[in-house]
A protein has these predicted regions:
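Phosphate/NTP-binding elements of NTP-utilizing enzymes
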Residues: 1-302
């Protein structure tokens, strides 16, 4: 049966399944006692878009992703969670069910999953790796026997999640199925970052997989991977260049008229940039009604 929307305006996505899977199986990181992982609403929106499917071709709409937010927003837990999802969950499109909704199958039914958490230094990989390992302390260990988390690798029932900090030359040909490229504003020509990014993307696309970058603000003119990705996404959106699949460019900063010297203006700018994670008592400024206050202390950012 072909795609059949259940309501007007609905688009096909495996994102609803992914969100349910994350909440059911993953633990919230950085807490003393187990709590289920619960993404913020804007994180949910990113996942729904990331797993959106073209109803005519069955391909994912987006071939690459870029999730840009300020430090502390929560990029690392959400991307660490997606590493686990891509390693274990049913995220390879496998047709439509009897109701015309998309269904998936795990990578392990197609090929051996190989997920990479990549950066240009060991410390940078830990930004995503450490919360990811904590998320594996939840029910996922009982549901998927054979998952074994270690300092630099997570063994899977079939496949692995690995850290990757080596040069572009040494990753050539790795059968990657999904990769997170962490802090790509630091991936510059002098440390081999662009070469590493190119090799990882090439390896991943050859296997039908995808990559997501998680940059902080980049410095224009540095030639970083983050800068180049932003330029490519903008050019494609404006019709100045053609790419096989669009880049999901989800990036938000404070409004350009934010006055850094005026407290109220600065607080309002931080509420915009931090979105749902802002702990402002008025809740978030993105949604109506607003989401409840999040975890980021805005006063500490001033």
């Amino acid at each position: 049966m072909p795609w059949k929307p259940s309501e007007p305006g609905e688009v096909p996505t495996l994102g609803w399944y992914v969100l349910d899977w994350m909440t059911e199986f993953l633990a919230r990181p950085a807490v003393d006692e187990y709590e289920p992982f619960m993404p913020y609403r804007e994180q949910e929106d990113f996942i729904l878009r990331w797993y959106q499917i073209d109803p005519f071709t069955g391909r994912f709409v987006y071939g690459r992703g870029l999730l840009g937010r300020p430090r502390g927003w929560g990029k690392s837990p959400i991307l660490g969670g997606l590493c686990i999802v891509e390693a274990l969950a049913d995220v390879v499109f496998d047709g439509w069910d009897a109701s015309g909704q998309p269904v998936g199958k795990p990578w392990s039914k197609v090929r051996t999953p190989l997920v990479h958490v990549a950066a240009v230094s060991e410390d940078q990989t830990n930004n995503t790796w450490q919360p990811m390992v904590e998320m594996l302390s939840g029910p996922v260990l009982d549901a998927y026997p054979g998952v074994e988390p270690f300092d630099t690798v997570v063994n899977l029932p079939r496949g692995k999640i690995e850290k990757r900090t080596s040069s572009g030359r040494t990753v050539k040909g790795a059968p990657t199925t999904f990769a997170v490229l962490d802090q790509t504003e630091e991936w510059v020509p002098s440390n081999g970052g662009p070469a590493l990014a190119q090799k990882i993307r090439t390896n991943t696309s050859k296997n039908g997989g995808r990559t997501i970058e998680s940059p902080n603000a980049y410095i224009p003119g540095d030639g970083s991977v983050a800068e180049k990705s932003a330029e490519t996404a903008t050019a494609a959106a404006e019709g100045r260049t053609r790419i096989d699949q669009p880049i999901l460019w989800d990036h938000r900063e404070a409004p350009p008229d934010t006055d850094m010297t005026e407290r109220e203006s600065l607080v309002n700018g931080l509420r915009v940039s931090y979105g749902d994670s802002s702990n402002h008592p008025g809740g978030c400024v993105l949604h109506d009604p607003p989401c409840p206050p999040g975890h980021v202390d805005l006063e500490a950012q001033i």
